[in-house]
Each structure stands twice: as structure tokens, then as C-alpha cells.
Amino acid sequence: MNVKGTENIVRFTLGTRRKYLAHVSTHTIVGDRSYDPATVFRETDYDVGQGFEHLSYQRSKFEAEGIVRQAKDQGLVWNVLRPGQIFGEASTGAYPLGHSAVTGLFYDIWKTVLESRVAYLSNVHFDVVPVDYVSRGILELGIRAGENFQTYHLTNPHVVRYTQVIETLAETGYPIELIPQEEYERRIHERRLRWDGTDYKSSTTSAFRWWFKRGIRLTDGGYTCSAHTANLLEQRGVRCPRIDRRLLGTYVDAGVAAGYFPRVPRKESGRAHDMEASA
């Protein structure tokens, strides 16, 4: 769909007066180079020798972006926008949790951690970018574009690692055990992750089990640099919030209110303790 659909869109756009296309790609076209801690994927990069084994979605987006780029020779005028890992609206946490059968991998990762109360240690960079920042970025740099043939990274310029994200989630009041990835893998294979006294299962645990069986390790990796894009947007009054307790707490609260995330155990809740102390 990504490839054929893009071909159709390019064909249609070439028949318009302006021949202009704001193409929404993804930062994950970096493919397996994201596993390399030496990788810094910049807006000026496209083909960096990446592979796509077991990464069919990323391959299709890479090919689709290539179609757009090559269509410049046919007269297509374009800008490419590469969003990161999109979460809810920054101030309210609003996100269509539970409104469809597919909630999203990144939310399911958090749900798995909060319910099983276990996560593995990892230095992989984990992007958390609010949907309103992404949408405003597309509007400002894609629709109100001052330049053409540019690529913009709509990821959070505040770069953090997976373990930092989990530690921040724990600060909102959830007891989370952080263990080495090897131990987490054993628990996955031996079905020792528990929820309400039963074997814990989720889309995330299924994905991890699949990755681990194929020798894919998620211990470290490169990151997507969005400093240039963030600077341009800041000049237009568009700022991305940092990945901190305030932002993650907003997402957690919204998820709890929607019945998607489990509630913080009251006796272990830092928030509840703070409320009682201030009463």
C-alpha cells in the first residue's frame, strides 16, 4: 500500500498546477542501521546502506520516499516529513486508546511494562513525540513551506534512552523491575511474566519472543537527529515538550482514565503519598 499508493499520489500530483507534494515518511527508514550505536540519522540522509531484514514496513516507506525523490526529474516539487514515535496530545494526553483493534506498538510496550511490572535494561533511543507537535510541524514545514526539496525530522529533539523512559514511568508511581535483557528473554521464553496470577501475554511479548528467537537484541542503537527541524519550528513558535515526568505522567493519566493502563497501586503510589502529605 505504501509503495503503490505513493505512486498513485505522485501521478495525481504531477497533474496539478503546483505539482507540490508534502510527503509523510518515517524516521524508521533508517532500517537496521538503527541497531548501530554509531548511527546518527540526519535530515540530509536517505540511503545510508541500511538493510531491512524483518523490517517490511520500514522497507516499504523507504521505497515510497524514493519514489517521491526520483519524481523530481518529472517535475514533482516536494518536501519530506519523517515523524517519530507518535504519542498523544501533549497537554491532555488525548489518544484513541481502545477505539480500534490496533492501538499502536509504543503504547502497547508501556502497557506491557505497567501491567507485568518488568522491563529490560536497554540503551536503545526511545522517541516520544506528541501528535500535536507532529501535526503542527507538517502544517508549518509541509503545507506552509518556504523551501522545497527539504527533509524534516519530526522526532522529539530531547533524545533519551529506553531505560530512562521506563525509569520516568516508574516515577509516576508504578513499581517496575528493571532487569538485564538476557533475564527478560528467559522470562519471556519460560512464560514467567505474570498478570493477575496468570501467564502475561500482549502484542509486545509476542513481538519480543519473535525477535529473541531470531537473535535480534535491543541493547543499544543509533538515533535520529532532529535539531535542524526543531530549530526551524521554534522560530515559528512551535516547541516540542521534553520527555520528562510531566509529559509521561500526562500520557499515563489519560491511559488510566481510558481504562487502557492499570491504575497505580495506591499504597505504592508516589502521587497518592504526596496528596496525603499535603492534606
PLM regions and their residue ranges:
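Glycine/proline-rich active-site loop of Rossmann-fold NAD(P)-dependent oxidoreductases
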Residues: 88-105, 141-152
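A conserved pocket-lining segment of Rossmann-fold NAD(P)-dependent short-chain dehydrogenase/reductase
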Residues: 48-52, 98-133, 137-141
